[in-house]
């Protein structure tokens, strides 16, 4: 049913981009907590989801299977050649180890899965806004500060601590074993970006950049792992089936 509205993806994406510029512009963006702020934020995310759905439907359009923009030889090698699996292997192991250890420490330590006290303290420090002339706040974007404040107000640290700990462990194990590397790296990027938005730098920028590389090289990054056998069996389920006309 949505296929007939595929042509709306581009104009809706432009509208979402305009709203994003409006939201992040210090001269225009309304203060956090106002109705205007809420409407702009909700509109942006609704449009983003709609555009993604329409883009997914676009794979069914005529000619979608034959559009192929050829890239430079080195990118084809890094992202499509199985020999590049050796290049991605140490990166995958490094990231997997970092995520797995971080998740394990949260599961076996205190303050994360036993009520989320450590996580609550982290959130409370992140949302603080110092007085004028006393430095910059940890969080740059008001919408992310509002999101963390919403979690604090709803006492979400209990279940969110479990979510972070298990998520980090799952990403780590997936990368170490080479299981669905692209998906594991994507969720790793989401967690790294969340820490960066909250004002925590540490190793997150490095891990973020390396995980982006694994996402781009998802076809071969897990070649020396389970993906070598798993991906050929799974195929790519999001790709539209090619209909071959019968011979007359």
Language-model features: locations:
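Extended, low-polarity transmembrane helix blocks
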Residues: 1-167, 177-248
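Transmembrane-helix motifs of polytopic, lipid-linked glycan transferases
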Residues: 170-174
């Amino acid at each position: 049913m949505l296929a007939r509205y595929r042509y709306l993806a581009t104009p809706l994406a432009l509208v979402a981009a305009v709203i994003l510029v409006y939201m992040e512009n210090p001269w225009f963006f309304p203060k956090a907590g106002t109705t205007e702020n809420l409407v702009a934020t909700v509109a942006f995310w609704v449009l983003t989801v709609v555009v993604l759905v329409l883009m997914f439907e676009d794979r069914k359009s005529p000619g979608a299977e034959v559009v192929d923009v050829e890239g430079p030889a080195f990118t084809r090698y890094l992202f499509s050649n199985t020999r590049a699996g050796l290049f991605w292997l140490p990166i995958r192991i490094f990231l997997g180890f970092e995520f797995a250890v971080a998740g394990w420490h949260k599961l076996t330590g205190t303050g994360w899965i036993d009520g989320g006290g450590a996580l609550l303290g982290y959130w409370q420090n992140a949302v603080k806004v110092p007085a004028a002339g006393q430095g910059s706040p940890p969080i740059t974007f008001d919408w992310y500060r509002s999101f963390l404040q919403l979690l604090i107000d709803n006492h979400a640290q209990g279940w969110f601590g479990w979510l972070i700990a298990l998520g980090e462990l799952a990403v780590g194990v997936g990368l170490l074993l080479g299981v669905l590397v692209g998906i594991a790296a994507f969720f790793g990027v989401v967690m790294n970006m969340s820490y960066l938005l909250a004002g925590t730098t540490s190793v997150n920028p490095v891990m973020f950049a390396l995980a982006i590389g694994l996402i781009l090289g998802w076809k071969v990054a897990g070649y020396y792992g389970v993906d070598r056998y798993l991906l050929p069996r799974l195929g790519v389920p999001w790709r539209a089936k090619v209909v071959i006309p019968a011979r007359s």
